[in-house]
């Protein structure tokens, strides 16, 4: 990846517009999880310390474009930023015609999705955003897979468009895991359906040494080996694809599973061999023998990419597989990267965040990167960097 980095630029007295991912949970006007806000602070401080005029922008939720509802306002985020930065962070509601501010100060622009044309990458809106800054900084990996006005269009027209530290760090970590991995390389892909992760599975099967499948996805692979999966979620029409993937790549399939009769936090869990699943069983987790097999694979791995739990870990009786796997990844000497909402929830639940080499902030963007797709917001930064090289 060849892009301009924020750290390479002189920011003194410059109008710096930073696209961040401040889409955080809010209850009764108060931020309930400020992880993303805290992650954004080093970039903000870098610009402030150089005497820049700092304008932050982000989306929050899915409001109706053109309808600035208080329910989707970024005011609670501005309040929390003010506390964390120990300075007043003003929320700018009308910012598209420019913001009056002094050097070394920061404002938060109101929800970008209040602007008509944001989601469809409207050209005129993109130009208006670009006109209020000297430097545009893309620092929201979680939205890098979306070609929208505040992620893509503004980067086309801003005088300078660069990558922020968060985005650069994310891309470096993913590149290290996928482009030049230490072997053996192992990927874990969980989720409810093969169909939703098919492109990821096919892409990873070409580069990994072992591919671990979990969750509902694993049921289709168990069925592909001729075993009964009872009433479990299973895509029987994709069994030929599962068989093809198993021919192309080493995919360890569970020899034992944990079943229940209903999807419930009070359902009784029963461990049994995969070959003994009854017609009225539902598979909700891998069994302890299979979990131990996966743990051994993780401990010997050189690179681990983790996207998705291997069971219904939200229910404690079906959480053993994901817990064993997660702790084995944490204990491994491998370079490990974890991404996806359910995966991060598991990382939090088992307290292993500081033992994973890199935690990806992106959901959809993380998946698309694993699929081998170009991320539009990164692609446009590469194009802008190329223009600078040609002019030099």
From Swiss-Prot:
Q: Which GO terms describe its cellular component?
A: cytosol
Q: Which GO terms describe its biological process?
A: gluconeogenesis; glycolytic process
Q: Which InterPro entries does the protein's record reference? A: Phosphoglycerate_kinase, Phosphoglycerate_kinase_CS, Phosphoglycerate_kinase_N, Phosphoglycerate_kinase_sf
Residues involved in substrate binding: 21-23, 36, 59-62, 113, 146
Main localization category: cytoplasm
Gene3D superfamilies, alphabetized: Phosphoglycerate kinase, N-terminal domain (3.40.50.1260)
Where does this protein act, in terms of pathway?
Carbohydrate degradation; glycolysis; pyruvate from D-glyceraldehyde 3-phosphate: step 2/5
Under the subunit heading, UniProt states:
Monomer.
* UniProt protein name: Phosphoglycerate kinase
Organism of provenance: Vesicomyosocius okutanii subsp. Calyptogena okutanii (strain HA)
């Amino acid at each position: 990846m060849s892009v301009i980095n924020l750290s390479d630029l002189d920011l003194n007295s410059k109008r710096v517009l930073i696209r961040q991912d401040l889409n955080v949970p809010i209850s009764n006007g108060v931020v309930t999880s400020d992880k993303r806000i805290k992650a954004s602070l080093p970039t903000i401080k870098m610009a402030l310390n150089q005497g820049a005029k700092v304008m932050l922008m982000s989306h929050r939720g899915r409001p109706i474009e053109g309808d600035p509802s208080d329910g989707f306002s970024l005011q609670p985020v501005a309040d929390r930023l003010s506390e964390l930065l120990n300075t007043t962070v003003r929320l700018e509601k009308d910012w598209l015609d420019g913001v009056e501010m002094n050097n070394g100060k920061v404002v938060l622009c109101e929800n970008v999705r209040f602007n008509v044309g944001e989601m469809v990458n409207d050209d005129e809106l993109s130009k208006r955003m670009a006109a209020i800054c000297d430097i545009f900084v893309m620092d929201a990996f979680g939205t890098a897979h979306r070609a929208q006005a505040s992620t893509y269009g503004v980067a086309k027209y801003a005088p300078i468009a660069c990558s922020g530290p968060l985005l650069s760090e994310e891309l470096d970590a993913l590149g290290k895991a996928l482009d030049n991995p230490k072997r053996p390389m192992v990927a874990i892909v969980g989720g409810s359906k093969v169909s939703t992760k098919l492109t990821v599975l096919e892409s990873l099967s070409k580069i990994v040494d072992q591919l671990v499948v979990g969750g509902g996805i694993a049921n289709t692979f168990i069925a592909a080996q001729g075993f009964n999966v009872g009433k479990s979620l299973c895509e029987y029409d994709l069994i030929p694809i599962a068989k093809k993937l198993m021919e192309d790549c080493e995919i360890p399939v569970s020899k034992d599973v944990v079943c229940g009769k209903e999807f419930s936090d009070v359902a009784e869990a029963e461990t049994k061999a995969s070959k003994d699943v009854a017609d009225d069983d539902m598979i909700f987790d891998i069994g302890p023998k299979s979990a131990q097999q996966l743990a051994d694979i993780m401990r010997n791995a050189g690179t681990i990419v983790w996207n998705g739990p291997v069971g219904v870990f939200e229910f404690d009786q079906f959480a053993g597989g994901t817990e064993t796997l997660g702790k084995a990844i944490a204990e491994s000497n491998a370079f490990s990267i974890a991404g996806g909402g359910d995966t991060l929830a598991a990382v939090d639940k088992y307290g292993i965040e500081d033992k994973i080499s890199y935690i990806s902030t992106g959901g959809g963007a993380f998946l698309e990167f694993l699929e081998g797709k170009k991320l539009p917001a990164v692609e446009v930064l590469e194009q802008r960097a190329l223009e600078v090289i040609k002019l030099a």
